[in-house]
């Protein structure tokens, strides 16, 4: 009842929006006769006038929307030979209003984007169009560039092939930038690791339009973007844990929970593992690493399946994106799982990595002042878009009514029977000449179908992650007569399948789904490949009780029906009731995934506030006009207080109890200072003396430099310590996040505990930052030829920072690049001529987070 009321309300809300937009469409159409009589030069001049009005602040985007849309449509007609339909104008307005335009396949989403892009690009603040892969970013930018150029805009493209920072800088400087979600996100993280404001490439986050918005903001939202560096850990444990895991047996030694993707050892399994590892207690503190490696090895061997979750290519394990079926090059599983899979597959094991910078897609895209998106399937996740991103979904009517027939699911008892039925259907369609597109849920299943079709001598084409480079050509030809195409998940393909009149007579493209995906949206995308622009088409799913969705989440109702009917081999059941039961199983999984994404976001929101504060400070430090004098002075006072506290000298204590010898030794060790007579001084006098002496020593040293050199050294050292401390803080936060779930056993909310602990860790990080910067600045040694030494030192520091930045590998692991360690008796790299141990190596052991 409640659901009906909600759907009625939502339906009416959508209808109201469409009615409102239709009035706007009439106003845009009324201008068409005005603009189609203008010459090209006059049309360009009319658009240029709008640009001047906006940039001079004389009008708003909303007030010139009708003119901008009408001019863009006229320009598109002349330059691209394509005129925007009325429904496309509605889509453009939804995008401009910061909404998600749900438009069916073949409705021309790529062209719709031009309307909102051109209007918002008039501000001169940059518009980012985000796509799911490099192919689509290149294709869309190049196809639409003539239109944008005609209207006076420059277009930039950001893909994984653009490695040079100068090229990226030029691309981002353009009015309109096309690129992938990963590249935009990583550029943001890399920008916040740069040591010069002029090297930052991305600029401001004004307006973004996300193509295939559900794929990026929903499917990929569980995967954070991570820039990482190596952690030196021994690799033998992975091989040992793998051999132990392979000797343990399912059900006898452990149980598998497929729903939650967890493997639990039983008593027998623990005893066997302890015997194989030759340890007394697998779960003691000293064996914590072994138990962790065993957990990951069990997952690698019994939960992660080759050619479904990953492929082995060129002696490397490459992840397969479960939603798009594409290879996720450069991405790695975290927490040692990737290494466990490498051990299982007997390929080179790469080192584990430590997070240097990270952000989730949710928090990256929420940086934009205005955000919108387009997709063929968004209504099933409308509530999530609204809750997480504050994005409303508008279903745009189709230009021509959809003619496709969506038949009920056919359910078989076993997978073998299901595949035989699919082959029979393909044979029937192939003889008729009707093209068929077969969707599979994994590479493994597409290979099974491939072998069966070869056996029956039916010519066909396979599109899965292994052939992703040829996907556009394969999909384009899927609508020709007699074509049989097998494809893993069709999400985000972005290529239309066009058919001719002969195929229309045969009934159009026939879609066969061999398994229901965990998300209804992916199934709808597969169905949506047929019936574009009013073409005929048919879609039907073939399922079996052995499919993972039905096995893990399916209700007993379906199994009960099958048993009562007493079906013989090869027979199936087909009814609306069964189809609805399958959809209810999908809803269960979607809710699970939603909770998982929400959970990830709740945790990342905590880190996000800290990230914003650190990046804000970093940007202030990068500003050459930033003066650190006051900050350094305050930090010096706090450091002096910290030194007294470490020596157990506290305010209000009697001076006869002060351990002055301990204080002197500590100050000499940490700051390289000799302090004079401190006997009989009270706390305040002692603190004042220490601050004065630190200040005198510092000013005496720095006064030999020019003001600009001094400021630059202070800024670079501050940045160096900030980055080092932030890396350590992220590492500590990672460790905290890994174990925080266990607090639930103590009747405590893990999220509340995480917030408390991370806040305390952040306070510790801030204190350490202040102490370490003061210490570093105090121990800098400047000798003769001050200017030359200072310049050399600045250059050395900058070179080291740049080298560190270049050594970082994007995402989760890569072969580490090791820097040579400076021996204690080597000359100090600062150029002082002293040995390292008595110059910059003198600072003593690091403490706290920097240990």
From Swiss-Prot:
May bind 1 zinc ion per subunit. ATP binds at residues 88, 106-110, 496. It comes from the Bacteria. Its EC number is 7.4.2.8. SUPFAM superfamilies: Helical scaffold and wing domains of SecA, P-loop containing nucleoside triphosphate hydrolases, Pre-protein crosslinking domain of SecA. PROSITE patterns: SECA_MOTOR_DEAD (PS51196). It is found in: Cell inner membrane; Cytoplasm. Its main location: membrane. It is an enzyme of class 7 (translocase). CDD domains: DEXDc_SecA, SF2_C_secA. GO terms for biological process: intracellular protein transmembrane transport; protein import; protein targeting; protein transport by the Sec complex. It is a peripheral membrane protein. Zn(2+) binds at residues 828, 830, 839-840. Belongs to the SecA family. Part of the Sec protein translocase complex. Interacts with the SecYEG preprotein conducting channel. Has a central role in coupling the hydrolysis of ATP to the transfer of proteins into and across the cell membrane, serving as an ATP-driven molecular motor driving the stepwise translocation of polypeptide chains across the membrane. This is Protein translocase subunit SecA.
């Amino acid at each position: 009842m409640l659901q009906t009321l909600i759907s009625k309300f939502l339906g009416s809300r959508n209808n109201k929006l469409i009615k409102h937009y239709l009035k706007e469409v009439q106003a845009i159409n009324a201008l068409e006769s005005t603009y189609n009589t203008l010459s090209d030069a006059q049309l360009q001049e009319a658009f240029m006038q709008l640009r001047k009005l906006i940039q001079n602040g004389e009008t708003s985007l909303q007030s010139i929307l009708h003119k901008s849309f009408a001019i863009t449509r006229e320009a598109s007609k002349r330059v691209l030979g394509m005129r925007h339909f009325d429904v496309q104008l509605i889509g453009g307005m939804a995008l401009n209003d910061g909404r998600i335009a749900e438009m069916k396949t073949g409705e021309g989403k790529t062209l719709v984007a031009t309307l909102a892009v051109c209007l918002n690009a008039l501000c001169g603040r940059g518009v980012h169009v985000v796509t799911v892969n490099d192919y689509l970013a290149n294709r869309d930018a190049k196809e639409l560039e003539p239109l944008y150029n005609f209207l006076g805009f420059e277009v930039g493209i950001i893909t994984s092939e653009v490695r040079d920072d100068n090229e990226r800088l030029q691309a981002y400087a353009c009015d309109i930038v096309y690129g992938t979600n990963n590249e935009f996100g990583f550029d943001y993280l890399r920008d916040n690791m740069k040591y010069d404001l002029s090297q930052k490439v991305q600029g401001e986050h004004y307006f973004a339009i996300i193509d295939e918005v559900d794929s990026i903001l929903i499917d990929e939202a569980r995967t954070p973007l991570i820039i990482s560096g190596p952690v030196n850990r021994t690799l033998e444990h992975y091989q040992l844990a793998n051999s132990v895991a392979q000797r343990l047996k399912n059900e006898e030694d452990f149980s598998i929970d497929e729903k939650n993707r967890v493997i639990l050892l039983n008593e027998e399994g623990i005893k066997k593992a302890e015997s194989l590892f030759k340890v007394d207690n697998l779960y003691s503190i000293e064996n914590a690493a072994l138990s962790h490696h065993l957990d990951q090895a069990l997952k690698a061997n019994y939960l992660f399946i080759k050619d479904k979750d990953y492929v082995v290519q060129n002696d490397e394990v490459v992840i397969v994106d479960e939603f798009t079926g594409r290879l996720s090059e450069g991405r790695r599983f975290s927490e040692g799982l990737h290494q466990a899979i490498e051990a299982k597959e007997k390929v080179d094991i790469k080192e584990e990595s430590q997070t240097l910078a990270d952000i989730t897609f949710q928090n990256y895209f929420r940086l934009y002042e205005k955000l919108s998106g387009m997709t063929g399937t968004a209504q099933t996740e409308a509530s999530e878009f609204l809750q997480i991103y504050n994005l409303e979904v508008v279903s745009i009517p189709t230009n021509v009514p959809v003619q496709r027939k969506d038949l009920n699911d056919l359910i078989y008892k076993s997978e073998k029977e299901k595949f035989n039925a699919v082959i029979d259907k393909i044979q029937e369609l192939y003889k008729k000449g009707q093209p068929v597109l077969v969707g599979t849920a994994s590479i493994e299943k597409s290979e099974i179908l491939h072998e069966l079709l070869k056996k029956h001598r039916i010519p066909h084409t396979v599109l899965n992650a292994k052939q992703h480079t040829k996907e556009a050509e394969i999909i384009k030809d899927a609508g020709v007569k007699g074509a049989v195409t097998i494809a893993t998940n069709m999400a985000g393909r972005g290529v239309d399948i066009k058919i001719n009149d002969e195929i229309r007579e045969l009934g159009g493209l026939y879609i066969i789904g061999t398994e229901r995906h965990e998300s209804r949206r992916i199934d709808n995308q597969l169905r949506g490949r047929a019936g574009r622009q009013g073409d005929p088409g048919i879609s039907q799913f073939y399922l079996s009780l052995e499919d993972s969705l039905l096995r893990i989440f399916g209700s007993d109702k379906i199994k009960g029906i099958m048993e009562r009917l007493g079906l013989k081999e090869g027979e199936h059941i087909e009814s609306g009731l069964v189809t609805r039961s399958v959809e209810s199983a999908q809803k269960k999984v979607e809710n699970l995934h939603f909770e998982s994404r929400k959970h990830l976001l709740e945790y990342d929101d905590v880190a996000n506030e800290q990230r914003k504060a650190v990046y804000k400070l970093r940007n202030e430090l990068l500003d050459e006009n930033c003066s650190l004098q006051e900050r350094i002075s305050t930090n010096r006072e706090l450091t002096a207080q910290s030194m007294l506290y470490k020596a157990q000298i506290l305010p209000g204590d009697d001076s006869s109890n002060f351990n002055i010898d301990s204080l002197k030794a500590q100050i000499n060790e940490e700051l390289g200072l000799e302090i004079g007579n401190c006997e009989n001084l009270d706390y305040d006098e002692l603190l004042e003396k220490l601050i004065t002496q630190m200040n005198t020593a510092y000013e005496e040293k720095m006064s030999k430099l020019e003001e600009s050199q001094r400021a630059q050294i202070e800024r670079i050292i501050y940045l160096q310590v900030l980055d080092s401390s932030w890396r350590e803080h992220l590492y500590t936060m990672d460790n905290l996040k890994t174990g925080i779930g266990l607090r639930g056993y103590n009747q405590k909310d893990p999220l509340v505990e995480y917030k408390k602990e991370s806040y305390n860790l952040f306070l510790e990080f801030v204190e350490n930052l202040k102490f370490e910067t003061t210490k570093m600045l105090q121990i800098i040694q400047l000798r003769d030829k001050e200017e030359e030494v200072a310049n050399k030192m600045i250059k050395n520091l900058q070179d080291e920072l740049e080298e560190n930045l270049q050594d970082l590998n994007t995402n989760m692991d890569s072969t580490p690049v090791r820097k040579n360690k400076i021996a204690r008796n080597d000359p100090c790299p600062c150029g002082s001529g002293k040995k390292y141990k008595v110059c910059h190596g003198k600072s003593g052991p690091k403490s706290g987070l920097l240990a």
